[in-house]
Structures are given as structure tokens and as C-alpha cells.
Amino acid sequence: WFSFIREAYQGAEDMWRAYSDMKEANWRDSDKYFHARGNYDAAKRGPGGVWAAEVISDAREGIQSLMGRGHEDSMADQEANRWGRSGNDPNHYRPAGLPDKY
């Protein structure tokens, strides 16, 4: 039980780091990459990380949907979220030219 909580906390940190990096990079067409990367990193923590990534991703997309963001873009974000959470390489979504720092 304690390991699940630790994994969830660390997974939430991974999600925040990906979000912060996305804002810092401010790189065109990079949002799907950062969605996939945050979910990928969180899921590597274990079941708690997977849970945290799913809850955070669903909440974020739900809020953005309420704010009038397009359904198609939200669905594409969720696909990138699932891709990363499933352990697939987030670089699949990496845009050309994004600095190696990310």
C-alpha cells in the first residue's frame, strides 16, 4: 500500500515535470510528445504511477473540454497519454528540432 502511494506521488511529479518542460520549451507541435513522456515516466514507477498519470490526464482533458477546447485535439492528447502509459516510446510524438534537453 505504501509503495502504491509513493509511486503515485512520484508519478505526479513526473507529470508536473513534463508539463513544466512543455511550458519552458514553448515548442510548436510538442504537446503530444510531453503528454506521452509524462505518462511514460509516471507509468515506469509502477501501478501507483499509472494511476496518477491516468487521473491527472483525465482531469486535465476534462477541464480543457469544459473550457471549450476542441474534442479532436483532446482525443489526440488522450491517445498520446495512453501511448506513454502503455510503455511505448514517447519519442514517437517528438517534433523535429525539439532541443535534446527535453
UniProtKB/Swiss-Prot annotation:
Subcellular location: Secreted
PROSITE patterns associated with the record: SAA (PS00992)
Pfam entry (one): SAA
InterPro entries: Serum_amyloid_A, Synovial_Prolif_Regulator
GO cellular component, one term: high-density lipoprotein particle
Main location as per UniProt: secreted
Purpose: Major acute phase reactant. Apolipoprotein of the HDL complex.
Similarity comment text for this entry: Belongs to the SAA family.
Illness association: Reactive, secondary amyloidosis is characterized by the extracellular accumulation in various tissues of the SAA protein. These deposits are highly insoluble and resistant to proteolysis; they disrupt tissue structure and compromise function.
Protein name: Serum amyloid A-5 protein
UniProt organism field: Mesocricetus auratus
Lineage: Eukaryota, Metazoa, Chordata, Craniata, Vertebrata
